[in-house]
Amino acid sequence: MNEKALRVRYQKNKVKKERWKMYDVIIIGAGVSGAAAARELSRYNAKVCVIEKEEDVCCGTSKANSAIVHAGYDAKEGSLMAKLNVRGNALMEQLSKDLDFPFKRIGSLVVCKDEEDMPNLKALYDRGVVNGVPGLRILSKEEVHEMEPNLEDDICAALYAPSAGIVCPFNLNIALAENANVNGVEFKFDTEVTDLKKSGDIWEVHTNQGVFETKYVVNAAGVYADKFHNMVSEKKIHITPRRGDYCLLDKSAGSHVSHTVFALPGKYGKGILISPTVHGNLLLGPTAIDIEDKEGTNTTREGLDQVIAGANLNVKNIPMRQVITSFAGLRAHEDGHEFIIEEVADAKGFIDCAGIESPGLTSSPAIGEMVADLLKEKMHLEEKKDFIATRKGVLNPNTLSKEERAALIKEKPEYENIICRCEMITEGEIIDAIRRPLGAKSLDGVKRRTRAGMGRCQAGFCSPRTMEILARERGVNQSEITKSGGNSKIIVGINKDSL
C-alpha cells in the first residue's frame, strides 16, 4: 500500500476513533477569550476541550494587537464592553503574578490639540467616571508636557488614566492556556470546525479530525464567530474584520514615551497610539480599515504611511529609522459594537463569545469569568479541590543574580548557550518552551514563548539554530519544521547528500 493510501486509512481510522468522544464543554478558538474561559472552567469538575484550527494558541486576533490594558473610559456607559473592561483591568495585575506573565501599569494619556476639542475630552472623562475608572484627571498643558517631554508643542491638555497598562499578549494567552491544560482541559490543534449539529440535548461538533460531542459549545472564534453563530441561529450576526497596521521600533527607541499616548477617539476606534511595550520596544498603530477577508493580515504602504503620520501628529522626533518590523492584525468588529456573551436564544447550549474587539485583551479575564459563571449555573458545577491556580513561565536567566545564574548553568549547561543574540535567548529557554505544557512546535511558537527572533535582526541569525533545536526535541527532520504550522515549511529538502 502506497504512502497516500496509508495516510487516507489513518485519517479514516482517526475520524472513527474520535467520533464518540464526549465533553461537557467544547470551546471553539484558543485565542485569549477562549483560553480565559478554559482556565476559569478548569476550576470545576467538567470535561472541557478547546478546538483550534491553527497549530498553536494565540494565532489570530490575540497575537497582533496593541497589547494595551485599557482603563475603561472609552466604552459606552452601561455597556457590557465597559463593565468587562474595568473588571478585566482590575484582575490583570494579580493574574500576572499568579500566571507569571509581564504586565506594567504605566498609565495612559488621551491628548487634546485644540481648545475646541476640550468638551470631547471632558465627555471622555465623565464617561470614565460613570464606568468606574479610578484616578482619572484632566491635565493642563504644563502638566502633560512635564509628564511626556516628547509630545508635540501644540498639545494643550490630556486625560490621564493611571490604571491603564501594557501586557505581553502572547504570554497572557499562553499562560491562560497552559494553566487550563495543567488543570485538565484538552486542546486539539490543527482541528477546524466544519459544521455544528444538534441531536436532542447534545451538540455534534464536526471537524476535519472527526466528530466530537458536547453538552455545551462556547463560540470564541474571533472573526469567525459570526460563521458559527449563523450555523445554529435564525437571528444572524455580522462581524467585519477590521485590519490594523502597526510599526514596531527597536528597544533603543523604547523610552521615547513612558505612557501610552492616544489621540481623541473617533468613529473607528482610538486612533494611532504610541506606546512602550513590556519588553522595551516602541509600538505605533493601529489603522482601522474594514475588509472582507478574514485572513487579510497583510500590511499596506498606505496603512503604514497612515501609522507614521498619525504618530507624528502627537509625538515629535520619533526615530523612524529604528523600525525593525511591521505587521497587521484583525479586530472582530460586530455591527452593534458590543461584546456578545450569552446563550443563543434559539440554540440552547450554544454560548456566544463574539464581537470581542478592543478592549477584548483587557477584558479577557472578566470574559472568562462571565462564560464560566453562565455554564456553572446551567451545569451545577462543583469546584475542584486540587485546582492549581499558579504557573511559572519560561525561565529567563537574565532575571537571576550572578550566583543564581552560575548555579543554573552548572546544573543545565544549555542555559549558557546563546541562540538569539538580539534578545539574549538561550538554548535552555527554547528547550523549556518546547517541552512545557502545550509546548512550541514551530518557529513562531518558540518566538511567542521566548522572544527568540523578535529582536533587531528578526530571526535572521537565530532561526537555523532554533530549527535545529526544534527538530532535535521533536524527533523530526528539519524539513518538517514550519514557521507557523500548515504549509509554512522553511526547508523544502536537502539539495546535497553530503549535507
What are these regions (language model features)?
Residues 24-50:
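N-terminal Rossmann-like FAD-binding beta1-loop-alpha1 element of flavoenzymes
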Residues 67-147, 271-272:
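Dinucleotide-binding Rossmann-like beta1-alpha1 core, especially the glycine-rich loop
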Residues 42-64:
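Glycine-rich FAD pyrophosphate-binding loop
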Residues 295, 426-437, 460-478:
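Iron-sulfur (Fe-S) cluster-binding segments and ferredoxin-like electron-carrier domains
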Residues 36, 196-201, 206-285, 289-300, ...:
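Flavin-dependent oxidoreductases
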Residues 159-216:
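Helical element adjacent to the flavin cofactor pocket in flavoenzyme catalytic cores
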Residues 83-86, 111-120, 159-178, 297-302, ...:
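Short beta-strand to alpha-helix junction loop
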Residues 269, 278-279, 290, 295-418, ...:
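C-terminal catalytic lobe of FAD-dependent flavoproteins
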